[in-house]
Amino acid sequence: MLGDKLINDCRIEVFGVTIEPLWVEAYCYDETHFPDYNTHRSRKQKNRFGQMYFHERGYGGVDICLSNSEDFCLSFLLKATLANGRFLTQTQLPRVLLSTGKTKADFEHLEDILHPANARHTICHTTRVNLTKPCYSDAPLTSFALDAIPKYDFRFARKNLRENVRAYLLAYMAAHPDCTEQECRAECRRVFGWVPDLVRTWVHN
C-alpha cells in the first residue's frame, strides 16, 4: 500500500523541517471507481504528485498529494508525524510548519519533497478517524507504525484501534492459552500503550 511506503520508505524535507510519517490516512476520489465523499475533492489533490496540500476543513491539516492525473484525487493526511524528532498530531503540524515564517503557498509550491528513507516500522492498518460521511468508513485506509503507538500520544486513534487490539489479543491468547487477564492487559499496554475497557470481555468470552 502507498501508505506503508510513505511511512517506511519516505521522509519529507521542507524548509529545514524533516517530517517522518507515523499515521497516514488515504483520501481518494474517482467518480467511477472510488467515489469517496470524505475526500475534499480539491484541485490540490489532483495531478500534484509529491506536493503538500494545506486544508482548513474539519480539524485542518496537511496532506501529501500522490495523484499524477487530473482524472482523480489522491492524497494522504499526515495524521501523526515526527517533525525534527518531535511528535505532532494533525492539528499541530501546520502550526509548526508555519512557525518557520513560510506561508502555506510556499510549502504547497515545493516539489521534490519526498526523499528515500528506511524506517523499518511494523505497519498495520485500520479505519480512518472521525469521518463525516459513511462511504468507505469500514475500509482499512489508514496505515500506521505499530511500534510508535506505545511511545507517543495516540489517544485520538483509540476508538479506531480497538479492533486491532482485539485481533492482536485473540492471537496472543491462542498462542498462550494459560495466560491470565492481568498478563493480557500487560501485553496490550506493552504493544498499544493502553488497555481498552473491553479487554476483560474479550479475555473471558
Residue ranges, per PLM feature:
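A cross-family signal for N-terminal binding/gating loops and helix N-caps
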Residues: 1-171
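Basic, alpha-helical nucleic-acid-binding regions used in initiation and control of genome expression
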Residues: 166-205
